[in-house]
């Protein structure tokens, strides 16, 4: 594939698209984030063919870069590190276990949607990082036996502080 665009221009374009994806994610704008991801994905397609070929390994490498860009956007949006790390780790496992490039691309979309939903929830609720982390923990641990002690350990706070803060913000205790 030949192009009239110089390598430097392609790199600048890719960085601009990564910044656009990061900003859209930070704002919780799923439509713009998905549009940015598609543009970014399409902008590097020909590079994949030139350098690595369109392989599963190349798609996994691309996914790691994209996940990092999205995670930084979420960090800038104030998503607590424990939530950010959990979302990212789940995605990493899905990517590692993917058997096709299509599965990896579907995971990109799922990841963007999950991050944007989490960011929008943070923006609209006004809850503290601790309460958002506790809510996220509860939502994603429903299949396990959840205790206040386990949740407090995961969030690195005392059980009493977790209960008091959660009740102050939400109006009920976490469990």
Q: PLM features: residue spans?
A:
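Hydrophobic residues on short alpha-helical segments
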Residues: 22, 132-139
């Amino acid at each position: 594939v030949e192009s009239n665009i110089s390598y430097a221009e392609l790199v600048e374009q890719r960085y601009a698209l990564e910044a656009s994806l990061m900003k859209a994610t930070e704002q919780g704008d799923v439509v713009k984030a998905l549009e940015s991801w598609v543009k970014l994905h399409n902008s590097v397609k020909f590079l994949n063919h030139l350098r690595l070929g369109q392989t599963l390994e190349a798609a996994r490498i691309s996914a790691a870069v994209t996940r990092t860009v999205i995670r930084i956007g979420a960090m800038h949006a104030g998503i607590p590190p424990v939530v950010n790390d959990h979302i990212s780790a789940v995605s990493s496992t899905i990517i590692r276990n993917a058997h096709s490039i299509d599965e990896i691309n579907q995971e990109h979309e799922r990841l963007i949607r999950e991050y944007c939903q989490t960011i929008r929830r943070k923006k609209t609720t006004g809850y503290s990082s601790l309460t958002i982390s506790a809510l996220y923990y509860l939502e994603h641990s429903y299949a396990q036996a959840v205790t206040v002690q386990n949740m407090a350990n995961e969030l690195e706070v005392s059980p009493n502080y977790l209960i008091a803060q959660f009740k102050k913000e939400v109006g009920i205790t976490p469990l």
